[in-house]
Amino acid sequence: DAKADKFVEGTHYTVVATEKTSQPKVQEFFSFYCGHCFHFEPVAQKLAKNLPAGVPLEKIHVDFLPAAAPEVQQALTRAYLIGKELDQGDKVAGLIFNYIHRQGAKFGSDDDIRNLLLVNDIDAAQFDAKFNSLPMLNTVQQMKTLQTKWSENGVLTGVPTVLVNGKYK
């Protein structure tokens, strides 16, 4: 493949595992509190739209940045996932990024997060039903497990980090 020939190991990517995933996928580890992630978001959205059919961009929000308590960061993860479930993931990500990076505002409580989404046309009943639901908490825990796995083996050292097929960084 001519395009693949342009990428050089050690220059454009690093091999981080011996085996790749059984199904193609791209994972982006990011934080709403990360300025680099804020600036990378348009690139990530374009990447998601240009991936081959059936290859998802899985956005994994991390909770290890010192800018906010892990509980606040996990609440933002849930808010983003609600947006994604409502087919408004990019919109919700943009709202949260702008609130933090353009407005310089801080989330003091779950209600602050809820209010931001509700004033921007996210349905209150759906938000309330999903925010603390067991499936939501399980999904957040799965993200945390991936964060821990890749952090402990030295792959996830900062954000944004993009992994392709669980093998290439």
Task: Please give the residue ranges for each predicted region.
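Short hydrophobic/aromatic-rich motifs at helix boundaries and adjacent loops
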Residues: 15-19, 50-52, 84-88, 115-119, ...
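A broad, low-specificity signal for short, low-complexity segments enriched in glycine/proline
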Residues: 19-21, 75-76, 119-126
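A structure-centric signal for secondary-structure junctions around beta-strands
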Residues: 23, 76, 156-159
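Aromatic side chains
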Residues: 12-13, 29-32, 40, 80, ...
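Extracytoplasmic thiol/disulfide redox context detector
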Residues: 1-68, 144, 148-152
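Structural alpha/beta surface segment adjacent to cysteine/selenocysteine redox centers
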Residues: 38-114
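C-terminal cap of thioredoxin/glutaredoxin-like
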Residues: 31, 118-169
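Short, flexible active-site loop motifs that bind/organize anionic cofactors or intermediates
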Residues: 27, 103, 117
